[in-house]
Amino acid sequence: MRVLYVNQTAQVSGAERSLLALLEGLDGRVERVVACPEGELAAAVRELGIEHEPILGTQASFRLHPVHTSRGLAEIGRSALQVRRLVARLRPDLVHANTTRAALLALLARNRSGPPVLAHIRDWVPEGRFSRFVLALVARRAAGVVANSAYIAGQFDGLSTQGPVRVIHNPVDLQRFNPRSADGGSIRRELGLDGDATVLAVVAQLTPWKGQDDAIEVVADLAGRGREVTLLLAGSAKFASTGTSFDNVEYERRLRALAEELGVGERVRFLGERSDVPEILAAADLLLMPSWREAFGRIAVEAMAMGTPVVATNVGGPPEIFASGVEGLLLAPRQSDLWASEIEQLLGDPRRLADMRERALGRAAEFELSAHATVMLGCYQDLLARR
């Protein structure tokens, strides 16, 4: 079976990491070709020994704009034409679109005799006319729709799809995220932190909806309670084009200013983009996920696989990953005083924290990569059997 994977951006964030994991998990079972722009993702694909085909791609926003929308539509049109030519040349059995935007490219590229398109929806689409058009197009024309959480699948409520929307949670590579092989002490030594220092971490792209500003406020609230902690912010302002929904570069500047303003500038460490995420998670006592609208929360599973409990918002995907009070805590978003209070109590109860670590390890094993790849392969086979 030959599958053409389509991704609209060269940047590597959560959706792309999940794609790379799937590609690795399918090794030897599927002939894989990836179409995406040149850049970080293309390099990672080639490093896996997988064929890469370059396309223009797009970072078009789903929000309408008098200038950016027309540019985005032009990018989408040119990229769709490139995908159509690739399909004609490569003759794949199936096209797997890795995101909502990638699904738009693949569906616009498809002709009636072309291979079926599987739309893998991993992102929350903002309200708006263009968003409604895209979701309706995906529902009507995709041979199959997979969502990475029930929360994301809910975007298709009321829309008629060719089959049921399947919820398949993102996987974790338990060999890479292994507490026996990752040295958290190396991170603490790099940052000059004592072994008994309390460390919190947020691992995410720098963008407002990820809530790093709320995490900084939690650190300030904890300091006001006499609990000194260090916050590690791992991630960068990846999506910084004029067509994106937020000014992420400006957001990073505001985060740095906020830390200074609240008097915790020395307690907040901006680590930038890091490849040693397992070590960062091993160094942390808790992973914070203060996102407003997390589609799934892959980093939560990775933290749990490292035995690091997670404190996340109770909206979006995290409630599907773990139970509050069992493997971590689920709290209302944007309430730093509540978060500080709950975190202070948890850190002050070593037995409870140790129990959460053990339960987190057990739960993370349920997201194992090989099983995920097998489920996805079955999804491919089901779609092809329906042709």
Q: Which residues are covered by each model-predicted region?
A:
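A short, well-ordered alpha-helix in the C-terminal region of glycosyltransferases
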Residues: R189, Q345, R352-E366, V375
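Conserved acidic donor-binding segment of nucleotide-sugar-dependent glycosyltransferases
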Residues: S324-G325, L329-S336, Q345-P350, A365
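Short hydrophobic beta-strand element within catalytic cores of glycosyltransferases
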Residues: P309-A312, F322
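Carbohydrate-associated surface elements
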Residues: Y151, P171
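Short His-centered aromatic/hydrophobic patch
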Residues: S79, A97-A103, I121
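Aromatic "clamp/platform" in nucleotide-sugar-dependent glycosyltransferases that forms part
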Residues: E273, W292
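A short helix/loop element that forms part of the nucleotide-sugar donor recognition site in Leloir-type
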Residues: N178-L193, R254-L255
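Conserved donor-binding/catalytic core segment of Leloir-type glycosyltransferases
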Residues: L4, D194-K210, I216-V219, L231-A234
